Amino acid sequence: GKDNYPWIHIPVGYFKTMHNPKTDWCYKTEPDESMNNISIRYPRGKTLGGSSSINGLLYIRGQHRDYDIWRQLGNTGWGWDDVLPYFIKAENQERGKDEFHGVGGPLSVSDQRIHLPLLDEFQNAAEEFGIPKTKDFNTGDNHGCGYFQVTEKDGFRCSTAVGYLNPVSYTHLRAHETNQ
């Protein structure tokens, strides 16, 4: 469906969009013997913008080495050095442009606005156990503990619908909505 349901655009709204038949396909996994035959909910977006309209807004890229393994397995063009320019081009990073981030792209990426003393203490405790603090999980090395960035701008979600589809108005282009 359309992305005009108000809870889609408010970051805390994912509590109202996940497991909601209006915005989520409400899939479940098959029961698994290793988990006492229970199935797990598997939220998938049922709206323009797909799952980027109902998720927790986390912006975390994969590990450098994982992309390079994909390339080594024969997936030409999928190594870290191949995909990084596209990550940079896609971003509108509030921290500004650097070797890993871009500005001016359709996807708004920002720091979380709320920092909790408990989470700050958790980071300190992790550091005591050898897990480094990090301020950026998108450099290709996700090892560490810290606050992740989110796909949000000015307090509103930046889904693929908001970032890529809504800004474009082509008379010859239509997004087909379906109930399946």
Regions found by a protein language model. Give the residues of each.
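Glycine-centered small-residue hotspots that permit tight backbone geometry or close packing
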Residues: 1-2, 144
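A conditional alpha-helix N-cap/helix-loop micro-motif detector
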Residues: 157-161
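A generic structural signal for short, solvent-exposed coil/turn residues
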Residues: 19, 34, 101, 168-169
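Short, surface-exposed, polar/charged, turn-prone segments marking secondary-structure boundaries
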Residues: 21-26, 75, 136-137, 162-163
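N-terminal FAD cofactor-binding segment of flavoenzymes
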Residues: 2-43
